[in-house]
């Protein structure tokens, strides 16, 4: 004898509240007896139209945390225990957000990015050319000095490279002080010039 229909209180599994997840119409197909070929989409899965209708902050939040909102039941039916690859993936949000932009605006933005990159390249080339010409000019000045001492002095005060590599000092502070005092000592009436 079949159990009597439940009145008022609890409803059966197929008679639960008439609410279904937005964007899914598979609940009615199952009630009519048609077998479901696809697993039901989770409640957080939106269509591109639903995503476009959201406020920007809501859309951003949904795209960031949408995969955390899965129902346990939907997850169990969507991801069977034996499968390694999930049956349903969160669609890539990039085409939805990019499709909201008009093609002309997108082309203008891309053109601006390309022009800025080209300008940066030109500025970099000019800077490199200037430093190379400066280094060549200083090297020529150093070569044309009358004495080696003058050439070394000029090279110290005008390095060919703008940022010469610093050679680390092998002496510590105490040793450096000792070397300076030795250089300034009187030896045979002559002072070593510093």
Curated annotation (Swiss-Prot):
Region spans: Disordered: 1-45
Composition bias, Basic and acidic residues: 7-18
UniProt xrefs under PANTHER family: PROTEIN LKAAEAR1
Protein name listed in UniProt: Protein LKAAEAR1
Annotated gene: LKAAEAR1
């Amino acid at each position: 004898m079949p159990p009597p229909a439940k009145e008022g209180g609890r409803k059966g599994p197929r008679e639960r509240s008439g609410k279904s997840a937005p964007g899914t119409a598979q609940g009615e197909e199952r009630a009519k007896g048609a077998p479901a070929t696809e697993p039901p989409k989770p409640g957080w899965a939106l269509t591109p139209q639903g995503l476009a209708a959201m406020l920007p902050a809501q859309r951003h939040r949904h795209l960031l945390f949408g995969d955390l909102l899965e129902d346990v039941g939907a997850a169990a039916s969507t991801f069977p225990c034996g499968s390694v690859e999930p049956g349903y993936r969160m669609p890539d949000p990039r085409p939805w957000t990019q499709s909201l932009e008009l093609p002309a605006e997108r082309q203008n933005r891309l053109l601006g990015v390309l022009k800025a990159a080209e300008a940066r390249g030109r500025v970099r080339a000019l800077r490199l050319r200037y430093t190379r010409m400066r280094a060549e000019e200083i090297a020529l000045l150093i070569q044309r000095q009358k004495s080696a001492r003058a050439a070394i002095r000029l090279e110290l005060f005008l390095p060919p490279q703008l940022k010469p590599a610093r050679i680390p000092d092998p002496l510590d502070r105490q040793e450096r002080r000792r070397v300076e005092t030795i250089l300034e000592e009187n030896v045979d009436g002559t002072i070593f010039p510093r």
